């Protein structure tokens, strides 16, 4: 299977699973209309106007961008032209669970944080390049993220110098009926491997990630129980009530720092990692096979 086919397959699986899960909303699914206050219209009693809370939407998007954004879980070295790696990753993201914007969750409670599971595949290419694809699921929800990445190692295996790499990423979320969310960014990382008594290869690594989060909403309604369409006051030309609203596209930047260690036993690779940003901390583990 070619790498292009592999990434396309991950995207197809995510869309299929997201469509199949629409009838099973979980505690971590979104009800974005809660991010607007509804006030009764003075011009049309019994009907409501929407007062959207944009700062809450931006804060929610920023936190979910970290939760569903790219994970690292690999040293700076590439796999080599013939290399192939597949693994399963588990991550837990700790956020400010008392923040007001979590009222937009189905349960209206973020609990202890957010857990995700991820299938991550990487393929080595010529010229110290590496292409990857990922499929991430947010537990207790119907949300998935499809990701792709391209890494270039500027130095690997050269004398005693550490390996150094640059990676670009793009992730998009599917399965959220109210939300459009995507992330893009780049990271730089360094690592150095060493063997221990011929049994295990240990590779500590660290790096920096610049992440850009794009978010917007679809059409929302603070009074879904009221089927009445908005009406126009003939005298003024103004709407008498307007329960529908949209959060326009928002762009936010985030700096993240990460570090971890990979333990390689033959083809079996175990990796532990932590990454930290201003609004969240993510702790991850990975079990993979490096061929």
Segments and roles (model prediction):
Residues 1-10:
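Bacterial N-terminal signal peptides that target proteins for export
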Residues 17-25:
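Sec/Tat signal peptide C-region and signal peptidase I cleavage site
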Residues 25-157:
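Transmembrane beta-barrel domains of Gram-negative outer membranes and organellar outer membranes
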Residues 74-75, 86-88, 119-125, 148-152, ...:
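Residues on the lipid-exposed face of transmembrane beta-strands in outer-membrane beta-barrel proteins
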Residues 80-82, 112-117, 142-146, 180-186, ...:
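Residues that define the transmembrane beta-barrel architecture of outer-membrane proteins
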Residues 90-94, 135-141, 152-154, 168-174, ...:
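Transmembrane beta-strands of outer-membrane beta-barrel pores
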Residues 97-108, 205-291:
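Outer membrane beta-barrel transmembrane domains
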Residues 127-131, 157-162, 198, 202, ...:
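Repeated loop/turn-to-beta-strand initiation elements of outer-membrane beta-barrel proteins
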């Amino acid at each position: 299977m070619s790498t292009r086919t592999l990434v396309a397959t991950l995207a197809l699986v995510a869309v299929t699973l997201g469509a199949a899960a629409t009838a099973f909303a979980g505690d971590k699914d979104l009800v974005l209309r809660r991010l607007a206050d509804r006030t009764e219209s003075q011009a049309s009693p019994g009907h409501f106007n929407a007062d959207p809370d944009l700062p809450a939407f931006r804060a929610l998007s920023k936190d979910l961008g970290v939760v569903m954004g790219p994970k690292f879980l690999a040293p700076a070295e590439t796999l080599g032209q013939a290399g192939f790696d597949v693994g399963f990753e588990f991550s837990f993201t700790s956020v400010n669970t008392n923040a007001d914007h979590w009222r937009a969750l189905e349960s209206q409670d973020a609990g202890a944080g957010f857990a995700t599971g991820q299938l991550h595949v990487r393929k080595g290419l010529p010229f110290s390049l590496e292409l990857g694809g990922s499929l991430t699921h947010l537990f207790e929800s119907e949300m998935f993220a499809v990701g792709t990445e391209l890494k270039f190692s500027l130095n690997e295996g050269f004398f005693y110098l550490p390996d150094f790499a640059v990676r670009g990423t793009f992730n998009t979320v599917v399965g959220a009926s109210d939300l459009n969310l995507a992330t893009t960014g780049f990271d730089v990382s360094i690592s150095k491997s060493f063997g221990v008594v011929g049994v295990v290869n240990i590779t500590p690594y660290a790096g920096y990630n610049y992440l850009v989060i794009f978010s917007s909403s679809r059409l929302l309604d603070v009074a879904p129980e009221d089927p009445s369409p908005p009406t126009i006051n003939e005298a003024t030309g103004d709407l008498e009530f307007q329960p529908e609203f949209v959060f326009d596209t928002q762009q936010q930047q985030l700096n993240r720092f990460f570090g971890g260690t990979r333990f390689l036993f033959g083809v079996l690779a175990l990796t532990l990692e932590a990454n930290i940003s201003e609004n969240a901390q993510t702790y991850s583990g990975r079990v993979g096979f490096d061929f």
